[in-house]
């Protein structure tokens, strides 16, 4: 790939498809840590989602080994769940008492940024194709929050005298919980892919990377990414 054997600084731009796996661990309601972190819902325990995001890298090619610094931002994940349950408490003398419980839960998770440093080794099969493997360490910033509201309503339905039933509200209660965290951690990952030299200076890159962002308080976050990009060596 030229008289310098492929050595020199380079820049790379990628478009990545990320599969994101978020595991949020809540303590048991009867456990010793039940008051430290609220048990909100199983719905937020194990989230699998995906996003498409750009990534930019700046590095140096030593003619076999490459080192690079990269930066990426991910899409914010958010979802909500609403459930309602009505339980009959009493039914006698044409009077029926029910308890209505409503749960509204909203969760967001945002990998705000990932700043990484990678070391990659290129296998030169021929003048065009170069498979590669590598390792990556990254400083990640993550924000996640959960809002939960539980509302209970006790009401009486009276059908006395055979007339149209009349509903009376007897009691209302509402409990709200909010949890928000912004965490920064150093995580580790692996990289693999194939580069195809379009010209001595321009390379088409298809890659895969796995990254474990670390244990973010009571949240574990892992990403699998497939990317397509171009690398230009100066």
Swiss-Prot record:
Keywords: Cell outer membrane, Membrane, Signal, Transmembrane, Transmembrane beta strand. GO terms for cellular component: cell outer membrane. Residues 1 form the signal peptide. Gene3D superfamilies: 2.40.160.20. It is found in: Cell outer membrane. Pfam families: Opacity. The keyword RNA-binding does not apply. Belongs to the opacity porin family. This is Opacity protein opA56.
């Amino acid at each position: 790939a030229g008289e310098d054997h492929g050595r020199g600084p380079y820049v790379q731009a990628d478009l990545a498809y990320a599969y994101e796996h978020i595991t949020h661990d809540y303590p048991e309601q009867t456990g010793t840590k039940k008051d430290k972190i609220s048990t909100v819902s199983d719905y937020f325990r194990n989230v699998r989602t995906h996003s498409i995001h750009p990534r930019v890298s700046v590095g140096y090619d030593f003619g076999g080994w490459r080192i690079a610094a990269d930066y990426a931002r991910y899409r914010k994940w958010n979802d909500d769940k609403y459930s309602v349950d009505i339980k009959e408490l009493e039914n006698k003398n044409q009077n029926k008492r029910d308890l209505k419980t409503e749960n509204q839960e909203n969760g967001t998770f945002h990998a705000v940024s990932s700043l990484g440093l990678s070391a990659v080794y290129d296998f030169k099969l021929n003048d065009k194709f170069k498979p590669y493997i590598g390792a990556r360490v990254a400083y990640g910033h993550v924000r996640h929050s959960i809002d939960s509201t539980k509302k209970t309503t006790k009401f009486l339905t009276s059908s006395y005298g055979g007339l149209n039933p009349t509903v009376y509200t007897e009691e209302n209660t509402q409990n709200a919980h909010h949890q928000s965290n912004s965490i920064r951690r150093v995580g580790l990952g692996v990289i693999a892919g194939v580069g195809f030299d379009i010209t001595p200076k321009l390379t088409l890159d298809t890659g895969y990377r796995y990254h474990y962002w670390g244990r973010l308080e009571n949240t574990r976050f892992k990403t699998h990414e497939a990317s397509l990009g171009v690398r230009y060596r100066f």
